[in-house]
Regions:
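Conserved phosphoryl-transfer motifs of two-component systems
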Residues: 52
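Conserved ATPase-coupling elements of RecA-like P-loop NTPase cores
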Residues: 46-49
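C-terminal helicase lobe and adjacent C-terminal extensions/tails of nucleic-acid helicase motors
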Residues: 1-25, 55-60, 64-219
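Conserved two-lobed SF2 helicase motor
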Residues: 27-43, 55
Protein backbone atom coordinates (compact mmCIF):
# COMPACT_ATOMS: atom_id res chain seq x y z
CA UNK A 1 0.00 0.00 0.00
CA UNK A 2 3.03 2.24 -0.36
CA UNK A 3 3.46 2.81 3.36
CA UNK A 4 6.79 4.50 4.12
CA UNK A 5 7.81 4.16 7.79
CA UNK A 6 8.95 7.32 9.57
CA UNK A 7 11.88 7.02 11.98
CA UNK A 8 12.15 9.33 14.97
CA UNK A 9 14.57 9.10 17.89
CA UNK A 10 16.98 11.27 19.85
CA UNK A 11 20.21 10.39 18.00
CA UNK A 12 19.79 12.91 15.24
CA UNK A 13 21.64 16.19 14.97
CA UNK A 14 19.43 18.92 16.35
CA UNK A 15 18.55 20.32 12.92
CA UNK A 16 17.64 16.85 11.63
CA UNK A 17 15.59 16.03 14.74
CA UNK A 18 13.45 19.08 14.08
CA UNK A 19 12.83 17.91 10.50
CA UNK A 20 11.91 14.37 11.57
CA UNK A 21 9.71 15.68 14.36
CA UNK A 22 7.77 17.87 11.93
CA UNK A 23 7.53 15.07 9.37
CA UNK A 24 5.93 12.71 11.89
CA UNK A 25 3.45 15.30 13.17
CA UNK A 26 2.48 16.40 9.66
CA UNK A 27 2.08 12.80 8.44
CA UNK A 28 -0.51 12.09 11.10
CA UNK A 29 -2.52 15.10 9.95
CA UNK A 30 -3.02 13.59 6.51
CA UNK A 31 -5.87 11.24 5.60
CA UNK A 32 -3.39 8.52 4.67
CA UNK A 33 -1.99 5.43 6.42
CA UNK A 34 1.17 6.23 8.37
CA UNK A 35 3.63 4.22 10.45
CA UNK A 36 6.00 5.94 12.88
CA UNK A 37 8.79 3.98 14.58
CA UNK A 38 10.05 5.91 17.59
CA UNK A 39 11.87 5.66 20.89
CA UNK A 40 10.96 7.36 24.18
CA UNK A 41 10.94 10.74 22.45
CA UNK A 42 7.37 9.91 21.45
CA UNK A 43 6.42 10.52 25.08
CA UNK A 44 7.13 14.23 24.72
CA UNK A 45 6.14 17.02 22.36
CA UNK A 46 4.49 14.84 19.69
CA UNK A 47 1.05 16.29 19.03
CA UNK A 48 -0.58 13.46 17.09
CA UNK A 49 -3.44 10.98 17.27
CA UNK A 50 -2.72 7.34 16.36
CA UNK A 51 -5.17 4.47 15.90
CA UNK A 52 -2.80 1.68 16.99
CA UNK A 53 0.02 1.65 19.55
CA UNK A 54 2.61 -1.14 19.78
CA UNK A 55 5.12 -0.52 22.55
CA UNK A 56 7.64 -2.13 24.84
CA UNK A 57 6.64 -2.04 28.46
CA UNK A 58 8.04 0.96 30.33
CA UNK A 59 7.49 2.77 33.60
CA UNK A 60 3.81 3.66 34.24
CA UNK A 61 4.33 7.38 33.59
CA UNK A 62 6.01 6.63 30.27
CA UNK A 63 3.27 4.21 29.23
CA UNK A 64 0.59 6.76 30.00
CA UNK A 65 2.44 9.38 27.93
CA UNK A 66 2.59 6.94 25.00
CA UNK A 67 -1.06 5.98 25.42
CA UNK A 68 -1.84 9.68 25.32
CA UNK A 69 -0.95 9.60 21.60
CA UNK A 70 -3.53 6.85 20.98
CA UNK A 71 -6.98 8.03 19.85
CA UNK A 72 -6.14 11.53 21.03
CA UNK A 73 -8.71 12.82 18.58
CA UNK A 74 -11.54 10.37 19.13
CA UNK A 75 -12.20 8.45 15.92
CA UNK A 76 -15.59 7.06 16.96
CA UNK A 77 -14.38 3.88 18.62
CA UNK A 78 -11.71 2.68 21.02
CA UNK A 79 -8.28 1.83 19.59
CA UNK A 80 -5.94 -1.03 20.44
CA UNK A 81 -2.66 -0.90 22.35
CA UNK A 82 -0.29 -3.88 22.26
CA UNK A 83 2.52 -4.33 24.81
CA UNK A 84 5.61 -6.55 24.72
CA UNK A 85 8.46 -7.04 27.22
CA UNK A 86 11.70 -5.08 27.32
CA UNK A 87 14.39 -7.73 27.71
CA UNK A 88 17.04 -5.21 28.72
CA UNK A 89 17.02 -4.15 32.37
CA UNK A 90 18.87 -0.95 33.24
CA UNK A 91 18.89 2.40 31.49
CA UNK A 92 16.50 3.93 30.98
CA UNK A 93 14.33 1.74 33.24
CA UNK A 94 14.96 -0.06 36.51
CA UNK A 95 13.47 -3.47 37.20
CA UNK A 96 10.90 -1.98 39.55
CA UNK A 97 9.87 0.48 36.81
CA UNK A 98 9.17 -2.38 34.41
CA UNK A 99 7.29 -4.38 37.04
CA UNK A 100 5.13 -1.34 37.81
CA UNK A 101 4.52 -0.92 34.09
CA UNK A 102 3.35 -4.51 33.76
CA UNK A 103 1.13 -4.02 36.80
CA UNK A 104 -0.51 -1.11 34.99
CA UNK A 105 -1.00 -3.15 31.82
CA UNK A 106 -2.55 -6.04 33.76
CA UNK A 107 -5.19 -3.72 35.19
CA UNK A 108 -6.52 -3.15 31.67
CA UNK A 109 -7.70 -6.80 31.30
CA UNK A 110 -8.70 -6.18 27.68
CA UNK A 111 -11.17 -3.55 28.81
CA UNK A 112 -11.78 -0.14 27.32
CA UNK A 113 -9.66 2.32 29.30
CA UNK A 114 -9.88 6.11 29.31
CA UNK A 115 -7.18 8.66 30.06
CA UNK A 116 -9.08 9.56 33.23
CA UNK A 117 -8.83 5.97 34.44
CA UNK A 118 -5.08 5.92 33.79
CA UNK A 119 -4.60 9.12 35.78
CA UNK A 120 -6.69 7.73 38.63
CA UNK A 121 -4.65 4.52 38.66
CA UNK A 122 -1.43 6.46 39.16
CA UNK A 123 -2.96 8.62 41.86
CA UNK A 124 -4.37 5.67 43.82
CA UNK A 125 -1.11 3.73 43.80
CA UNK A 126 0.85 6.87 44.64
CA UNK A 127 3.61 6.02 42.22
CA UNK A 128 6.41 8.53 42.60
CA UNK A 129 8.36 9.22 39.45
CA UNK A 130 11.13 11.70 38.74
CA UNK A 131 10.18 14.31 36.16
CA UNK A 132 11.77 13.79 32.79
CA UNK A 133 14.48 16.19 31.72
CA UNK A 134 13.35 19.39 30.06
CA UNK A 135 13.25 18.88 26.32
CA UNK A 136 15.63 21.73 25.57
CA UNK A 137 16.10 21.04 21.89
CA UNK A 138 12.38 21.50 21.20
CA UNK A 139 11.38 24.03 23.82
CA UNK A 140 14.47 26.18 23.99
CA UNK A 141 15.35 26.78 20.36
CA UNK A 142 18.35 25.58 18.40
CA UNK A 143 20.81 27.91 20.11
CA UNK A 144 20.54 25.85 23.30
CA UNK A 145 21.72 22.27 23.68
CA UNK A 146 20.34 18.75 23.51
CA UNK A 147 19.54 17.65 27.05
CA UNK A 148 19.22 13.96 27.96
CA UNK A 149 15.72 12.49 27.86
CA UNK A 150 16.35 10.30 30.88
CA UNK A 151 18.44 10.30 34.04
CA UNK A 152 21.67 12.28 34.09
CA UNK A 153 24.71 10.27 33.11
CA UNK A 154 22.99 8.17 30.46
CA UNK A 155 23.91 10.41 27.54
CA UNK A 156 26.38 13.14 26.74
CA UNK A 157 25.92 15.99 24.27
CA UNK A 158 28.54 15.57 21.56
CA UNK A 159 29.68 16.55 18.10
CA UNK A 160 30.65 14.08 15.38
CA UNK A 161 34.18 13.90 14.03
CA UNK A 162 32.77 13.71 10.50
CA UNK A 163 31.31 17.21 11.00
CA UNK A 164 34.40 18.90 12.42
CA UNK A 165 35.68 20.41 9.17
CA UNK A 166 32.33 22.07 8.56
CA UNK A 167 31.88 23.04 12.22
CA UNK A 168 35.24 24.81 12.46
CA UNK A 169 34.03 27.48 10.05
CA UNK A 170 30.88 28.23 12.07
CA UNK A 171 30.17 30.67 14.85
CA UNK A 172 29.93 29.11 18.30
CA UNK A 173 26.25 30.06 18.44
CA UNK A 174 25.59 27.79 15.44
CA UNK A 175 27.24 24.65 16.85
CA UNK A 176 24.17 23.27 18.68
CA UNK A 177 22.63 22.49 15.28
CA UNK A 178 25.23 19.73 14.98
CA UNK A 179 25.03 18.34 18.51
CA UNK A 180 23.36 15.09 19.45
CA UNK A 181 23.06 12.95 22.59
CA UNK A 182 25.19 9.79 22.63
CA UNK A 183 25.56 7.07 25.30
CA UNK A 184 28.24 7.72 27.89
CA UNK A 185 29.70 4.24 27.50
CA UNK A 186 33.05 4.09 25.68
CA UNK A 187 33.66 7.85 25.72
CA UNK A 188 37.03 7.53 27.43
CA UNK A 189 39.69 9.13 25.28
CA UNK A 190 37.32 11.29 23.25
CA UNK A 191 38.79 14.68 22.37
CA UNK A 192 37.08 17.94 23.24
CA UNK A 193 36.28 20.55 20.66
CA UNK A 194 37.40 24.09 21.49
CA UNK A 195 33.74 24.84 22.23
CA UNK A 196 33.81 22.31 25.06
CA UNK A 197 31.73 19.59 23.40
CA UNK A 198 33.11 16.07 23.28
CA UNK A 199 33.83 14.79 19.77
CA UNK A 200 32.65 11.27 18.87
CA UNK A 201 35.38 9.58 16.77
CA UNK A 202 34.37 8.47 13.29
CA UNK A 203 35.74 5.00 14.03
CA UNK A 204 33.05 4.66 16.73
CA UNK A 205 30.10 6.69 15.45
CA UNK A 206 28.80 7.37 11.93
CA UNK A 207 25.80 9.35 10.83
CA UNK A 208 23.24 9.80 8.08
CA UNK A 209 20.37 12.27 8.07
CA UNK A 210 17.70 9.59 7.45
CA UNK A 211 18.76 7.06 10.10
CA UNK A 212 20.66 9.21 12.60
CA UNK A 213 23.82 8.23 14.47
CA UNK A 214 24.80 4.57 14.60
CA UNK A 215 27.61 2.85 16.43
CA UNK A 216 30.23 1.26 14.19
CA UNK A 217 30.16 -2.45 14.86
CA UNK A 218 27.34 -1.93 17.37
CA UNK A 219 24.05 -3.76 17.65
Amino acid sequence: MGLRPLLYHSRFRYEDRVKHHRAVVEAFKQDQPVLAITTQVAEMSLDLSATLLITQVADPAGLIQRLGRLNRQYCGHFCDALFYPDEKVGFPYRQEDLEAGWALVRTFKKQEVSQRQLADWLEQLNISTKPKEHCVWLDGGWKTYAAPLREAGYTVTALLEQDIEKINSLKSSELPRYTLPLPTKNIKGWQRHKSGYLVAPEKQWRYCSELGAFEVGGE
